[in-house]
Amino acid sequence: MKDAAPAPDEITEPSEPRARELLAQYIAAFEIADAAALERVLRHDAALEMVGSRTWFAGRTTCLPYLATYVLGSPGDWRMLAIIANGQPAAAAYRRGADGALRAFGIAVLTVTPTGIARIVVFGDPDLVTTFGLPETLGINCES
């Protein structure tokens, strides 16, 4: 994973407009389940890792099929709120359950550069969402 990381001088700070723009585009892509939009914000060498899992993906052409097949689902399955975690742009993720309620899923922390998202680290722990002062659920009729 270390070889896949961008150089420290390539990382864009979360307060910079480009970092906020990439985070907003990432969130929008997830909320409308648009793999093509997600492809546009990921760097060609993007890495995806899920904390607690031994599996990780390196390269946009490896990350996207996994996300499109197993994660994105249908438009409206996800709702994300922009946050800052560990000093980086991040999203608090909520996933729609069978009853229609959006329940906390976890946190996705992004490493962004001027050329796109270089790394996504997913902490799939619903309890982390509430540590940011956010609710456990967003309700059945929550609009994105």
Cite the ranges covered by each PLM segment.
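Solvent-exposed, charged amphipathic helical/linker segments at domain boundaries
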Residues: 1-73, 77-79
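Low-complexity, glycine/alanine/valine/leucine- and proline-rich hydrophobic stretches
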Residues: 64-144
